[in-house]
Every structure is written in structure tokens, then in C-alpha cells.
């Protein structure tokens, strides 16, 4: 079967935004106008199509990025198609800060993005975070200033904030006509025409007319700015413009596309998804300005087993190349079981094909292949380069793994996931729950690599670790609902760490004589602190065979065995370097085990000697509040051992930035709500580890002793 859609007619894009910028509503409108969804689901009443997990519908926030395939033809009157039908693969991404890992994963497989802004709030903290992630993955984007019907909506302030907050160059391609309850539609600056929405048909029809006289001067001024930015993309167009010849409409679109793909500027349009105004121009802009898989540079991978990870194997959007794909999301579907959402970068995949998971070196077989629409699925027999599909029945594959042709192997990605900063203990209520809980936690961990499950060796408790309170709340909730596990949940605990504060040298000899062969090993170690975040490293500086080569792995094994449980309170030890500088052995009594025991004892002694200290996770906190609550909020943050970094104004609100220990942030959301009558909001994410003050360190050591 040949491909239905040439690659130039495909768009793989995501919708990225701050929580509450209207992402789910916008996606719903897109699905409605492109004919996939027959009734519009409102987030306010919990009926949105893309938010397909129960908790998302209850909490009104988007948690998982579901992938949807739909179709659109460029149109200006809503009736006449001006381009062939394009295939859109839309990835819905969450906007809450606890879920930035989801956004990271979806950005890794997108070609372009639509960034939503709330017209009143502008560029919010989570928008900045996601914007920086998109910059890192070099994802071209367009901006939709949504909620233009809201009180206080200000399009031009949003444009200014894009420049001030992200450093990008905004290029408005449309201006809103009116705002708040006077919003009528938009002026298309490329064609210099108005789109005026009318009637009650959910925004599916509008009138195109010339720009009214009172708006002409402003529209012409902004069009002039747009043309100046666009002609910079092409020498010929620039020369013609300097000679007084403006580009015609098709040329202007081509130049805007070129600038958008090169990330020289960001096209900006406006509207209100909730009021059904301005969504179709966004769909047209996706066709006009966002990349097809052919516009994206070849994906460079490395050969499996190459420890240097030299990226010298290219895979580009071409059906004739060997098959290579990236698994970017795993979901549990109540009807099909485990679904692996996969982006094909090159080649063709057919039902029944053999493939290799090159990340793990395991074989997989293609069972069922599906194209997804939020919660509906369409079975397919074949997928092509550039497609985003779901595979059922993969046994070994987890998020971030590469799937490829067994004869032409490549590893595309090594996704890095942040360390969890918060943990809770969970205990099943009954024996029957115990088995179910093990299965549930394994499934959830396979879906979400930023979530870890561990067993505490001393207490035997199961520990869930995650990126924030909301993250763990939702996982516990899913465990109860989807897997019907009843469990007792402990209070959240902070993931402390230990490190050292000075260099120390330890000379330790392990000797044991119990009839027959004894044990003997001597090691001399130097332990040195490293910069925060550098982690652990080991080197042997042995010369002249004081410790034979074959015993050195035993030395390192002994060192590593101590790292999981530090001397102060049993937390993992981080950021130090160990050098083996001398030692001694016995021809008969020495062994790898003897050296392991010696280095373990040396390390225990050495960590104390090197001034072990306790570290705690410090969170970057941003609070957005009306002016009148600022003093109280700053006072409260300071009482939580917070260091206020500065204040800023955003619209008519104050923005407070601070670093606060995670240990003092539990339940902060409720305190903030009551202090500000529910008007202040905050976001926080992990920033760095820092030393715990001595008096608190003593308390923690007593607690964990």
C-alpha cells in the first residue's frame, strides 16, 4: 500500500501552553473544525475529547499527551479549499509544571508547535519553561494569543512580553478586531482583510471584507513591520523592497515560512477559542508556516554499543531509508492494553514486521498498529516516515527507546530524565492489594520515567518518588481508579542527599585469619568534593602494581556500595571524587572480595573524616499575586527559609521570585489560597541542592537515626 499523503502535506505539531491558557479548548475547536469531533467538549464541564483520563476531566488540567490525527485544507471563506488536504498529527501536551517531563518527551518528536498565551496574563512562568525546552529541541513555532474575550485582554502587551521574556522576535501576522466582549474577529495582515465571525454556528462561518477605515492606519503600520522582518530572509526580496516593491501575498507567505522555520522570528495571531473566533487562521498558519517532516534536518543517531555516542548515522523523512522510530509515550488503554506512541523518522513499518529495540538490544514484533484520535483508534497495516502511530503489544520497550530495522541498527535518542525530588511511602491495605499494587506501580513507571518506585531496605516499605505533590497525587489516584488498588499513603518526604565538605585521605587495611586461606587488602584513598551537580567519579593512580589490576573493580564496587547510604542519615552521597593512590596485597590471601571489603570500610571512615554534610532540594518558586497581598506573601516565604530573589510586575499583578527549600513547601497551595482569597497562583520546580542549616540537619539525623 502506498502512502496516502505526500510528506510535504504532513504536519507534526504540538500545542504548548501554561496551565489555563486554554490549550484543551483550542485543541477541541481544532478537532471540531477539522471534522473529527461532532460536539464541542468544554473543559468547564469536564467533557473534552483530548483529556481522556478521568482525573484530567475532574481537575480540568491536561496530564497526558494524547496524539491525534486529523485533516485540514487551507481556506479563507470556510467553503473553498485553497490547498490540498493536509494531515495533522497533533500532540497535546500538559501545561502544569509537575508534568514538564511530558512536554520534554513530546517536543523531542514534534516538528513544530503552536504556543498559546492567555491574552490577559501573557507569557507566564510555565510558558517560559516550555519555550526554553522548545528552543533546546529547535522546534519552530507560531503563537496564538488566546482568550482575547477576557477582561483585561491586551494583544500588544503579549507581543511585547514575548520579546522581553523569551528573547524571541514576535511577528504579528494578524491583529484582533476589538477585545473583551467587543471581540469581532481578526485582521489578516498578509492579505489585509478582516475575518468577522457571526451567528451561532460555533464559529464555523465568517465574513471576509476589506479593513475598515478606522483600523487601516494601525494595520498598515503592523503590516509594514511584518514585511520588513520577512524580506530580511531573502536578498532578492530585500533588494526589491528597498526599490519600493512590496512582496505579493504568496511571496510574503513564503518569506514568513522561511523566517519561522529558521526561528528568525515567531508569527503571532489572535482570537478566542472559547468564543470560537480566530481558530481557523491558526490552522491555516500551521499549513503555511510550520515545518513538514521534509523541512526538518536529518535526525543523527549513533551505533548501538558506541560508548562515545558519536552521532554519525543519519535518518531522514524518506520511505526508502531503513526503518527507525522513537517510542515517546506509553499509555495503558483499557481495551487494547499497553500502547506505545511512536514517531517514525525513516522507512516503512508493516504489520508483522520484526524490529529491534536498539536501546536495550531486544527484538520486538509489530502486532497491532493504530492511528489515534484522542480515545478512538483506527487500525492500520502500514506506517511511513513522518507518521505518529500507536503500537500495541510491545514487551520490552519503554519511553525514549529506539525501534529500528534489525539489519540497519541505530540509537536515536538518550532521553535524560530529572531526578525525583519528593517521595511518599505506600502500603497496600490487604494481601490482595499487594499483588495489584506491584503490577500497577510497574505499569505507571513504564509510562512515566520521571516517576520511580523503590523499596526501602530497612522498613520494607514501597516508596513512590516523583516531581511534585500534584504528580504523586495523580499517580496515587490512578492506582486507585485504574487498577482498583486500596492503599495507605504516608506523608510526603523530601529526597535529601549527603556530600562532603573537604578532602580526606584514608589508609585502611583489612585482615582476617580464620584457619586456611585468610583475607588481606590494603587501600589508600583520597576523597575530594566536586562542584555541585558533577556527580561521582573514580580513578586509579596505582603505579608499580601495588594493587594488581584485577582487584581494582573490587575497590570501586566497595566505594559504590557506600554511596546509597551516607554516614549522617542514610541518604545517597553525591558530588565527590575518589582516587586510589596506594595499597598492598598478599599473594595468597588477597581477592576481589577482600579489596571490596577494605574500600567499603575505608569509605565509611573517609566520608566522616571529609566532613559529611546534609543537602536538601531547593525549589525555584514564582508567585503571581495582586499588589495588596505582596507583603504578607514575602513574609511567609521568608518564614519558610525562602530567599526572595526579586520582584517584577506583570500586567496589574506582582511577581515574586524566590528559592525555597522543598521541605518547607508542602501544602503551600492551601496557605497561599487563604492568604490571597484564592487570587494568587504559584509555580515551582527543582533548581539545585544546597546545604541544610546545622540545627535542622541535627533534627533530621535524629529522625532517621
Curated annotation (Swiss-Prot):
Belongs to the TRAFAC class translation factor GTPase superfamily. Classic translation factor GTPase family. EF-G/EF-2 subfamily. Pfam families: EFG_C (PF00679), EFG_III (PF14492), EFG_IV (PF03764), GTP_EFTU (PF00009), GTP_EFTU_D2 (PF03144). This is Elongation factor G. NCBIfam families: EF-G, PRK12740.1-5, small_GTP. Keywords: Cytoplasm, Elongation factor, GTP-binding, Nucleotide-binding, Protein biosynthesis. SMART domains: EFG_C, EFG_IV. InterPro entries: EFG_II, EFG_III, EFG_III/V, EFG_IV, EFG_V, EFG_V-like, EFTu-like_2, G_TR_CS. One of its GO terms (cellular component) is cytoplasm.
Amino acid at each position: 500500500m502506498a502512502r496516502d499523503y505526500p510528506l510535504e502535506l504532513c504536519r507534526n505539531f504540538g500545542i504548548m501552553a501554561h496551565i489555563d491558557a486554554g490549550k484543551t479548548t483550542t485543541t477541541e475547536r481544532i478537532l471540531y473544525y477539522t471534522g473529527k469531533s461532532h460536539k464541542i467538549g468544554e473543559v468547564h464541564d469536564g467533557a473534552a475529547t483530548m483529556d481522556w483520563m478521568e482525573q484530567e476531566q475532574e481537575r480540568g488540567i491536561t496530564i497526558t499527551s494524547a496524539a491525534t490525527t486529523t485533516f485540514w485544507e487551507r481556506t479563507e471563506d470556510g467553503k473553498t479549499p485553497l490547498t490540498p488536504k493536509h494531515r495533522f498529527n497533533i500532540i497535546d501536551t500538559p501545561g502544569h509544571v509537575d508534568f514538564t517531563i511530558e512536554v520534554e518527551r513530546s517536543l523531542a518528536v514534534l516538528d513544530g508547535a503552536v504556543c498559546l498565551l492567555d491574552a490577559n496574563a501573557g507569557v507566564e512562568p510555565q510558558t517560559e519553561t516550555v519555550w526554553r525546552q522548545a528552543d533546546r529541541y529547535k522546534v519552530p513555532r507560531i503563537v496564538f494569543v488566546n482568550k482575547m474575550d477576557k477582561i483585561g485582554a491586551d494583544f500588544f502587551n503579549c507581543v511585547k512580553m514575548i520579546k522581553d521574556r523569551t528573547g524571541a522576535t514576535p511577528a504579528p501576522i494578524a491583529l484582533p478586531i476589538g477585545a473583551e466582549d467587543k471581540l469581532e474577529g481578526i485582521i489578516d495582515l498578509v492579505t489585509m482583510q478582516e475575518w468577522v465571525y457571526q451567528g451561532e454556528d460555533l464559529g464555523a462561518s465568517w465574513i471576509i471584507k476589506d479593513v475598515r477605515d478606522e483600523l487601516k492606519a494601525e494595520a498598515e503600520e503592523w503590516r509594514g513591520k511584518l514585511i520588513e522582518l520577512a524580506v530580511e530572509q531573502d536578498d532578492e526580496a530585500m533588494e526589491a523592497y528597498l526599490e519600493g516593491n512590496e512582496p505579493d501575498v504568496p511571496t510574503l507567505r513564503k518569506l514568513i515560512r522561511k523566517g519561522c522555520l529558521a526561528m528568525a522570528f515567531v508569527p503571532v495571531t489572535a482570537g478566542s477559542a472559547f468564543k470560537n473566533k480566530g481558530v481557523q487562521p491558526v490552522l491555516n498558519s500551521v499549513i503555511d508556516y510550520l515545518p513538514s517532516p521534509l523541512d526538518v534536518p536529518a535526525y543523527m543517531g549513533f551505533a548501538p554499543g558506541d560508548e562515545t555516542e558519536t552521532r554519525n548515522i543519519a535518518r531522514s523523512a524518506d520511505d526508502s531509508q531503513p526503518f527507525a522510530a522513537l517510542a515517546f509515550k506509553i499509555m495503558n488503554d483499557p481495551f487494547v492494553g499497553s500502547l506505545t506512541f511512536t514517531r517514525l523518522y525513516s522507512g516503512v513499518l508493516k504489520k508483522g514486521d520484526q524490529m529491534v529495540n536498539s536501546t536495550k538490544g531486544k527484538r520486538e514484533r509489530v502486532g497491532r498498529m493504530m492511528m489515534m484520535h484522542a480515545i478512538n483508534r483506527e487500525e492500520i497495516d502500514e506506517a511511513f516516515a513522518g507518521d505518529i502511530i500507536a503500537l500495541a503489544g510491545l514487551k520490552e520497550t519503554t519511553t525514549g527507546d529506539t525501534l529500528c530495522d534489525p539489519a540497519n541498527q541505530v540509537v536515536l535518542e538518550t532521553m535524560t530524565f530529572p531526578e525525583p525530588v519528593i517521595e511518599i511511602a505506600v502500603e497496600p491495605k490487604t494481601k490482595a492489594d499487594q499483588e495489584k499494587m506491584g503490577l500497577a506501580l510497574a505499569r505507571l513507571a513504564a509510562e512515566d520515567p520521571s516517576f520511580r518506585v523503590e523499596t526501602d531496605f530497612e522498613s520494607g516499605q514501597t516508596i513512590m518518588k516523583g516531581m511534585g505533590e500534584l504528580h504523586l497525587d495523580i499517580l496515587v489516584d490512578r492506582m486507585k481508579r485504574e487498577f482498583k488498588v486500596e492503599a495507605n499513603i504516608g506523608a510526603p518526604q523530601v529526597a535529601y542527599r549527603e556530600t562532603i565538605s573537604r578532602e580526606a585521605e584514608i589508609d585502611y587495611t583489612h585482615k582476617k585469619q580464620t584457619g586456611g586461606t585468610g583475607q588481606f587488602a590494603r587501600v589508600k584513598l583520597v576523597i575530594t568534593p566536586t562542584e555541585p551537580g558533577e556527580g561521582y567519579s573514580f580513578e586509579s593512580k596505582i603505579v608499580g602494581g601495588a594493587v594488581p589490576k584485577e582487584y581494582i573493580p573490587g575497590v570501586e564496587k566497595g566505594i559504590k556500595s557506600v554511596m546509597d547510604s551516607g554516614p549522617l542519615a542514610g541518604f545517597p552521597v553525591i558530588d565527590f571524587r575518589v582516587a586510589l593512590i596506594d595499597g598492598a596485597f598478599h599473594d595468597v590471601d588477597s581477592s576481589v572480595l577482600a579489596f571490596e571489603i577494605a574500600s567499603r570500610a575505608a569509605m565509611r571512615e573517609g566520608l566522616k573524616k571529609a566532613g559529611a554534610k546534609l543537602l536538601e532540594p531547593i525549589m525555584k518558586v514564582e508567585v503571581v499575586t495582586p499588589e495588596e497581598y505582596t507583603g504578607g506573601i514575602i513574609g511567609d516565604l521568608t518564614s519558610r527559609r525562602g530567599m526572595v530573589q526579586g520582584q517584577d510586575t506583570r500586567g496589574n499583578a506582582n511577581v515574586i521570585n524566590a528559592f525555597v527549600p522543598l521541605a518547607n513547601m508542602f501544602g503551600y497551595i492551601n496557605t497561599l489560597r487563604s492568604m490571597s482569597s484564592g487570587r494568587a497562583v504559584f509555580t515551582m520546580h527543582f533548581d539545585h541542592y544546597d546545604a541544610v542549616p546545622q540545627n535542622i540537619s541535627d533534627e533530621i539525623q535524629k529522625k532517621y537515626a
